[in-house]
Structures are given as structure tokens and as C-alpha cells.
Amino acid sequence: MNDIFYMKRAIELSKLGEFTTAPNPNVGCVIVKNNIIVGEGWHEQAGKNHAEINALIMAGEKAQGGTAYVTLEPCNHFGKTPPCCNALIKSGINRVVISNIDPNPKISGNGILYLKKHGICVKTGLLSKESKQYNKGFFKRMKTGFP
């Protein structure tokens, strides 16, 4: 198994929130340790746990030392939910692979910087085009301000 395999799974998971996450984006997350998926999650509904949190809950202690594959950059600010970056750091994840940088100005690269600052290896851009197609409206709204 490789990064592409796990990111494809995260993209598939992101689709599960297609009709329930607006105005938030569809996001999927897979947590892998020793080439075994130990946690999966997706953003199920606006105002509820983000994909990373759902995957971390499923993984529990098995997340420590693992890799998180996320279709969109993890948030690092408090909104309706706490920052996903803090949860990833606290879990002991040591690597995060991100498909797309979040275009939301509140995040846009800040989540990546925060993770790196806390010693987490970050890789970006994996299957970006494939992942972005399931969030066309979100990316358009962030870029133009229009739905």
C-alpha cells in the first residue's frame, strides 16, 4: 500500500458527506499505522466533528506514530468545533498527507505551518485535482465569495 491508495480511500470517504456538510466542504480522513487502516472518518454535518476527529476517535491509541491522510488541510482555529490540528498533534500522529490546501483565509496554509511547527511531517498536493472535484462549490465560494 502507498500514499495514493490511502488518499483515494480518504476521497471516497469525503463523498459520504456530499449532501450534509454545506456550507462546509466534504472532507475524508484515513489514519494508517504499519500499513493498516486504524481509523476512518468524514465530515458528516456542518457544526459536527470534522473528518480528522472522527478518524481519530476510531483509531484511538493506535493513531500514535501513524499517518493521517486528509483531503483538505486540517483547521487550526476554533469555530463551531475545536482545531483539528491540535487533535492530530495530541494523538501522536507523526505524518500528515494533505490533498488540498484549504482556500479559507482563516486556514490557508496556517494548518500546515502549525503541524510542522509541532514536529509533524507534512506532504501536500497528493491527488489534489481528484479531491478538489468533490468540493467545486466550496473552492469557488472561497475564491469569489459567490456560491
Swiss-Prot record:
The keyword Iron does not apply. Residues 1-123 form the CMP/dCMP-type deaminase domain. Pathway: Cofactor biosynthesis; riboflavin biosynthesis; 5-amino-6-(D-ribitylamino)uracil from GTP: step 2/4. Gene3D superfamilies: Cytidine Deaminase, domain 2. It comes from the Bacteria. Binds 1 zinc ion. One of its GO terms (molecular function) is diaminohydroxyphosphoribosylaminopyrimidine deaminase activity. Its cofactor is Zn(2+). This is Diaminohydroxyphosphoribosylamino-pyrimidine deaminase. The gene is ribD1.
